[in-house]
Amino acid sequence: FMSGHLVVEAFDEGGNIIAYRQTDNEVVDDGEQCILKMLFATPQTSNSGRGEYTSTGACTGTLTGAWTNIAIGTGTTAAADTQVVLVNETSSTGGLERGPATTMTWTNGTGADSTKIVLSRTFTSDSLTAHTISESGLFNSTVGDANGMLARQAFTGVALSTGDSITITWTFTVGN
C-alpha cells in the first residue's frame, strides 16, 4: 500500500507565510507501472531497469533516475491517473523551473511503523510577471518536456510576485 501527501507553503519577500495548502496526491498510472517494473527488473534484458515486460500506454519513457525532481505549474485541471506531465509547467519562468529536491528525508519503518520519504524544494520567483501556482508534479528527470512523472496534484492557486517563494513538500508512505 502506497499513499502520498502534498504540502504547499508560500512566503513573501520578508519570510511571512502568505499561503498554506495540503492534500493527498495522485500517483499516476505511469508512476505505478514504473515502480513495479523497477522493483522486478531483470538486469540482463534490453529493458534493464524497467523489467522485461512490454509497456503499452504507461511507463514507456526512459527511466533516467529516481523521482527526485519537483516541478510546479499554473494548470488547474484536476489530477488524473492518465496524466504524464503537468498541465502548464513553469519550465522557463525565472526561479520557478523544475529541479531536484533540496531536502530528502527517509524514515525506515518496522513492525507497525510505516516507511516513508519526504522530498521538498523551495522555488523563489525572480520573474517580473506574477504567477498563480496551482499544480505540482514529481519527476525522474530535470528535462521539462520529458515524461517520467510519478505523481501530480492540483491545488487552490497561490499567487507569487517577484521575491515570493513557494516550498513544495511531497511525502510518500509505504506500508501500514
PLM regions and their residue ranges:
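Small cysteine-rich, disulfide-bonded extracellular modules of the LU/uPAR three-finger superfamily
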Residues: 1-134, 141-176
